[in-house]
């Protein structure tokens, strides 16, 4: 465990420097075309819609603060209406900087109505040494909705010679389909994260991890996603249960992780990934 002592003056400085940001919007299908509904933005979080409103809508989240530090609070709340289709990514990888104070808070709420589809495809989250972050992802799908979701986390910037030795990473996921909880997971890494990642039962020395979740998902989808297995550079496990499919990734570097995740996501999506992933 990591303990940090701060004075009242230090706490006041931390509070004054904390960033906040929130994005809340919905999309809806109108005559077979997905259109934006209500939109709320605040603080340093923004959303842009770079493509024309065709059959499906694309959106890009932008953090104008340039990164996330201790005590920052960010929230995203997205609702996809009946028969609407939305693909969302981020403008760049998100960086979580070191903190000697409170953890950053990230809250993500995603709702998809009957016949709707959401592809939640943010780029990587990079944790610097001594970063402290707590993330919550809550997903609520109607019984006839579909989802393609990925998240990846890089511990340190190995290409820059930087490693993550200590910090805190808490990641809480909850997925409900038709009001029923079908997936619940909480990951907690606290203290000497470098040593934890070195354990064979944790990451076996890997510094880049990822998850792709597909709903609905079954054995046939798993077989299709495994077709690229011979070319994987990371350790990849793919399975299905409870009507969903999931792929787990663990790699020694971010480049291998991204390459393998892109291969799986392309097969799952049946189409090209957002152009920002290709840059």
Curated annotation (Swiss-Prot):
It comes from the Bacteria. Keywords: Chaperone, Cytoplasm, Nickel insertion. Its main location: cytoplasm. The keyword Chaperone applies. GO terms for molecular function: nickel cation binding. The keyword Cytoplasm applies. GO terms for cellular component: cytoplasm. It holds the Pfam family UreD. Belongs to the UreD family. Required for maturation of urease via the functional incorporation of the urease nickel metallocenter. UreD, UreF and UreG form a complex that acts as a GTP-hydrolysis-dependent molecular chaperone, activating the urease apoprotein by helping to assemble the nickel containing metallocenter of UreC. The UreE protein probably delivers the nickel. This is Urease accessory protein UreD. It comes from Rhodopseudomonas palustris (strain HaA2). The gene is ureD.
